[in-house]
UniProtKB/Swiss-Prot annotation, chain A:
Expressed in the endosperm but not in the embryo. Detected in young siliques, roots, leaves, stems, young flowers and anthers. Probable transcription factor. Required for suppression of cellularization and promotion of nuclear proliferation during early endosperm development. The FERTILIZATION-INDEPENDENT SEED (FIS) polycomb complex is required for suppression of ALG62 expression at the end of the syncytial phase of endosperm development. Residues 6-66 form the MADS-box domain. Residues 99-133 form a coiled coil. GO terms for cellular component: nucleus. PROSITE patterns: MADS_BOX_2. This is Agamous-like MADS-box protein AGL62. Interacts with AGL36, PHE1/AGL37, PHE2/AGL38, AGL80, AGL86, AGL90, AGL92 and AGL97. It is found in: Nucleus.
UniProtKB/Swiss-Prot annotation, chain B:
One of its GO terms (molecular function) is transcription cis-regulatory region binding. Expressed in the central cell of the female gametophyte and in early endosperm. Also detected in ovaries, young siliques, roots, leaves, stems, young flowers and anthers. This is Agamous-like MADS-box protein AGL80. Interacts with AGL61 and AGL62. Forms a heterodimer with AGL61. Interacts with MEE14/CBP1. It is found in: Nucleus.
Amino acid sequence: MVKKSKGRQKIEMVKMKNESNLQVTFSKRRSGLFKKASELCTLCGAEVAIVVFSPGRKVFSFGHPNVDSVIDRFINNNPLPPHQHNNMQLRETRRNSIVQDLNNHLTQVLSQLETEKKKYDELKKIREKTKALGNWWEDPVEELALSQLEGFKGNLENLKKVVTVEASRFFQANVPNFYVGSSSNNAAFGIDDGSHINPDMDLFSQRRMMDINAFNYNQNQIHPNHALPPFGNNAYGINEGFVPEYNVNFRPEYNPNQNQIQNQNQVQIQIQNQSFKRENISEYEHHHGYPPQSRSDYY
Amino acid sequence: MTRKKVKLAYISNDSSRKATFKKRKKGLMKKVHELSTLCGITACAIIYSPYDTNPEVWPSNSGVQRVVSEFRTLPEMDQHKKMVDQEGFLKQRIAKATETLRRQRKDSRELEMTEVMFQCLIGNMEMFHLNIVDLNDLGYMIEQYLKDVNRRIEILRNSGTEIGESSSVAVAASEGNIPMPNLVATTAPTTTIYEVGSSSSFAAVANFVNPIDLQQFRHPAAQHVGLNEQPQNLNLNLNQNYNQNQEWFMEMMNHPEQMRYQTEQMGYQFMDDNHHNHIHHQPQEHQHQIHDESSNALDAANSSSIIPVTSSSITNKTWFH
């Protein structure tokens, strides 16, 4: 049976001849083997030691509680596990707790990864649907002609200016003199629309209303950080756990009298978010600073 | 085939735990056997059960003795170099999965921003409620695309195109969705080209740095050492990713004069459009083109109505990351 890919097909149980394939197979299967061993320890409380010499004669080993203790027990033909002392009991209990938290965290990350992959596939479908409209500027850049590229380039530069001006609105407090330029922003808006009609005051008011909606939207994002209880003691969990519950937030009703107050809140929200991001990174670094073999607390 | 995912926790039911142990122990032994056979290597496994004082071993007692002896004769450093316990192994897996998740999120974000960029190009910017993070990412995306377009333009200009072909393609372009007046109006002045060039230089440098980091991370480093090194790579990638997007905008913010100048340019271009329209001799044809654009925009809006929900959801996640 000839198949194009190597997914889900049986292979001969003999030594592989291709050297690079052999190396890749060893790496993948060793990892899977250790994974199965780890699961067995977690589910059934077994003690395991696995020693593997790679094709390059390097040695890989996995053990629970650790390789040396299990090997010692085997060599000495000792039927009793060395857990008779109280200290050993306490250490075992704490290790189990740490392993349980690590397992929970791993399950959570893998679940999020699954969700993110589905999202990526959805976005791909949307892109396919948009491309089907037949707009030439969405073709790969290599397939466009020179004049098309130059026109496209001009439009992209215009769009970049619009994005920059829109972004500067969020920092009006930092660049107050730029607020005067909002009338020119309407001109830019007109150009991008492709129409040459001067926008009237109604259009200007609509844009201001959209900006206010954006403020409300941001305002919703910041509150859950403080309102939600901590997600366990896991530093990762605090960051990851916020995400699923975030979607239940509601948008407060728009009140024109609070326009200025919300503008001020906007600036504060930005500052808080930036500091929050830095804290996230700091926590991330701090966690990974632990050496892997350390017996110290995980938290 | 299991019908549902097994929860990774100690099985409290005694009989269920015993059955699971029996099945999984057998599977584990089988996997050691397959690995040893396929790669022609030396391996052994020792499994102690809570219910039995005698261990299960592979391949045999004497086989394990031989492998263990070989293992123990290695220098101490070599023995522990790639040794992991369950705690260390789980941490490695978490780090690996976290990096994969981060990369997947980045890919999703780029795909989303590409869609938003093309929608904005045909005048649908209002349907997305873009916040500062979205605008920052969108600006970065536009800059990347501009870099590709500029590179392609240089290639075509260097190869040289016949005048006839240019003329015919120009006609084709005018038949497209962007009418000729816009093409004329959007020709960028020299100063703007220079600015875009400088930005592209920065982006090019950033791109040059990133592949090295990814290669370093993907290199099959030593297991023990890898866990020490991976966090640094992860942090470096995170910081650089953050810095790239942030610096794009900060560069613009640090030059408010340029922003004011660009705003004036936009106004000037707008007046230029008016001037061009005044000379135009076929207003009806122009009206027809505008109508075509509106129809196309409406079609795009209908087909993309799902985007706001997706965008909001992704934005929420990106916000906390």
